[in-house]
A protein has these predicted regions:
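Terminal amphipathic alpha-helical/low-complexity segments used for targeting or macromolecular assembly
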Residues: 1-64
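Residue-level marker of positions within ordered structural domains that often coincide
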Residues: 45, 103, 161
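Left-handed beta-helix
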Residues: 64, 69-70, 75-76, 81-90, ...
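Conserved small/polar residues in nucleotide/adenosyl-binding loops
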Residues: 154-161
Length: 162
């Protein structure tokens, strides 16, 4: 787990020109705090303690403005920059080396059972205010433009921009 924390810190240092030091990221960056808390919540969920997992998730959302469901799968070196207003749903899968900016929703479109949230492949950038809804896939290294809306049954191929 600590290796992933180090990777996350390095990711923020590399992608945020305003980041001055690792201690600044650990203490002051809501995106880092939300990712750290998500990993704890997911551990509790995986060990059959869903109430504790949801408690951690909701407490973190209240503190950071970033709501990540404990069931969401988040890859390595994911950066959440200016994290206010981010929602990541239960069956969302986020790959490695993904950048997520403020106001992004990775959400469902209803009360369907099973896979109902997006899959974000490696290397994707999701711009500010983008809404990616339903069980769709955003392909490797794609860029979802700020304010874009991508809905169910759409497949944005690798290296495309919405």
């Amino acid at each position: 787990m600590f290796e992933r924390y180090k990777e996350d810190i390095q990711c923020f240092m590399e992608h945020d020109p305003a980041a001055r030091s690792p201690i600044e990221i650990v203490l002051l960056y809501p995106g880092f705090k939300a990712l750290r808390s998500h990993r704890k919540a997911q551990w509790f969920l995986n060990h059959k303690m869903p109430f504790i997992a949801r408690y951690i998730s909701q407490r973190t959302a209240h503190k950071t403005g970033i709501e990540i469901h404990p069931g969401a799968k988040i890859g390595r070196r994911v950066c959440i920059d200016h994290g206010n207003g981010i929602v990541i749903g239960e069956t969302t899968e986020v790959g490695d080396d993904v950048m997520i900016y403020q106001g992004v929703t990775l959400g469902g479109t209803g009360k369907d059972l099973g896979k109902r949230h997006p899959t974000i492949e490696n290397g994707v950038m999701i711009g500010s205010g983008a809404k990616v809804l339903g069980p769709i896939t955003i392909g490797r290294n794609a860029k979802v433009a700020a304010g874009a809306v991508a809905v169910s049954y759409t497949h944005l191929r690798a290296h495309e921009t919405s």
